[in-house]
């Protein structure tokens, strides 16, 4: 049996976003949080086939479009990447919104705005359209907050590190320069991957954060290594790690949200403040704290992220059960 998937490929500030516009598995008409559980249980082979080699690669990410059960949303989305099926993905949302509008997949109820149901909740996206193309997008992300301060772990190759745990749609370990880590300068991509893997393993022993409003969202699977900006167009720089060995090419939407929540929790950003976050390749997301929020009684923020994406092609992908590598593979 051969299954086909119609995909539209894009990138958000350098990070790939593969939008599955046709062929995704049929799921019950329930919330996206419930659909995510069903997808992971029964259909994770789709994620692996579309994200892993030979059809994808180590940093591939994407989204599958679904109808929403919410009357206040235009559509719904599941976010998939090499590491799993995520509650939320900021870069993925920016790419998804750009594809949905430029390719005519969705007709928004309100021109200039899309409302999307995600497993993490409803997110709104404002977009600027010029000559039929989406020039810029601003994502209004889910409520974000600082979960834990100064979690001390021993990381082989560095020694003792103090990290914060923050939520921006996914839980992040937030690392700032300190005695045993001087910053991103001089770190290779291989260094970031190796140290992130060790950090995540060490954190898993001492810290297992759970979202206060949804216990299905738990655990630190992402890290953001933060440093001073590399250009005058940014306020900070970060390397986002996820999966087994992936480094986000964009500044990271949920990562930038988590970083702003951490800075807010430490009193270094306030309501209405902006934070321009630079990626390793020099692209920038403009974050802004739109308002305050309570997340299970914990003070947090309502972040927005400004960025852009570009459509790069159409792709009909076949998954043939006769193929011994039909469901993809990874080299670890």
Curated annotation (Swiss-Prot):
MF (Gene Ontology): 4-hydroxyproline epimerase activity; trans-L-3-hydroxyproline dehydratase activity
Keyword Iron found: no
Keyword list, A-Z: Isomerase
Entry function: Catalyzes the epimerization of trans-4-hydroxy-L-proline (t4LHyp) to cis-4-hydroxy-D-proline (c4DHyp). Is likely involved in a degradation pathway that converts t4LHyp to alpha-ketoglutarate. Displays no proline racemase activity.
Protein name: 4-hydroxyproline 2-epimerase 2
Catalytic activity as recorded in UniProt: trans-4-hydroxy-L-proline = cis-4-hydroxy-D-proline
Residues holding substrate: 222, 248, 253-254
Family: Belongs to the proline racemase family.
Cross-referenced Pfam families: Pro_racemase
Active site per database record: 89 (proton acceptor)
InterPro entries: Pro_racemase_fam (IPR008794)
Entry EC no(s): 5.1.1.8
Domain of life of the source: Bacteria
